[in-house]
């Protein structure tokens, strides 16, 4: 892989796809508190981070695994409703810690309207955190999981075998997917009532 004498190797964390140094530089210069949202294959992680020369300090954090362990969430841990609940949980914790505003940091993810990252940010905004963002393009039905419930009902009627395979974890945890919107409201009320 020859490049020539003028080739400049990028920083390691940029090569690994972990850090966008141009954006990070602007956050550091402005000394802003950041709402960091990261998606993994299984979970959603949301954190409030402040810059420190020795390394960023995480002030408060929320992990979608907490929804299952502390609040009894039986749905998937990385879908749209879980993203909203994780963001909402982070917003409640941030307000308790005295943080009232933050700037959204989505890292190297491509910003797509209605995505899970923006759903988590919307959850934090609805909890009372002030975050300067434009139109997030998120529909309330998708936040509550109505689209998942309607797809599950349609699939159960057309192909019960595929339904059992795709929604096996829901059924294993004791939640029928058609009940997801009501279960979402139940967990949201638990978080609102001081469960954070």
From Swiss-Prot:
- Stored InterPro entries: Rbsml_uL18_euk
Q: Might you report a single GO cellular component term? A: cytosolic large ribosomal subunit
Keywords attached to this entry: Ribonucleoprotein, Ribosomal protein, RNA-binding, rRNA-binding
Q: Which GO terms describe its molecular function?
A: 5S rRNA binding; structural constituent of ribosome
Transmembrane stretches, by residue range? Answer: none
Keyword tRNA processing in the entry? The reply is: no
Asked if Ribosomal protein is a keyword of the record, the answer is yes
Question: According to the lineage, what is the superkingdom?
Answer: Archaea
SUPFAM superfamilies from the UniProt entry: Translational machinery components
* A single BP term in Gene Ontology: translation
Subunit-level organization? Part of the 50S ribosomal subunit. Contacts the 5S and 23S rRNAs.
NCBIfam families for this protein: PRK08569.1
Question: What role is this protein assigned?
Answer: This is one of the proteins that bind and probably mediate the attachment of the 5S RNA into the large ribosomal subunit, where it forms part of the central protuberance.
- Family in the record: Belongs to the universal ribosomal protein uL18 family.
Question: Per its record, how is this protein called by name?
Answer: Large ribosomal subunit protein uL18
Species name: Sulfurisphaera tokodaii (strain DSM 16993 / JCM 10545 / NBRC 100140 / 7)
């Amino acid at each position: 892989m020859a490049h020539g004498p003028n080739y400049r190797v990028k920083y390691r964390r940029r090569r690994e796809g972990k850090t966008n140094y141009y954006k990070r530089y602007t956050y550091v210069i402005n000394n802003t508190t950041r709402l960091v949202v990261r998606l993994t294959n299984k979970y959603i992680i949301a954190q409030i981070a402040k810059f420190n020369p020795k390394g960023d300090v995480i002030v408060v954090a929320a992990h979608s695994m907490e929804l299952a362990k502390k609040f009894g969430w039986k749905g998937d841990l990385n879908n749209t409703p879980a993203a909203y609940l994780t963001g909402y949980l982070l917003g409640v914790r941030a307000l308790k810690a005295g943080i009232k505003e933050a700037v959204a940091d989505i890292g190297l993810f491509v910003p797509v309207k209605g995505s899970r990252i923006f759903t988590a940010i919307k959850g934090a905004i609805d909890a009372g955190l002030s975050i300067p963002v434009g139109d997030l393009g998120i529909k309330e039905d998708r936040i509550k999981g109505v689209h998942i419930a309607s797809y599950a009902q349609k699939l159960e009627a057309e192909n019960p075998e595929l339904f059992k395979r795709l929604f096996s974890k829901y059924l294993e945890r004791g939640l029928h997917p058609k009940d997801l919107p009501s279960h979402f409201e139940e967990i949201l009320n638990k978080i609102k009532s001081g469960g954070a």
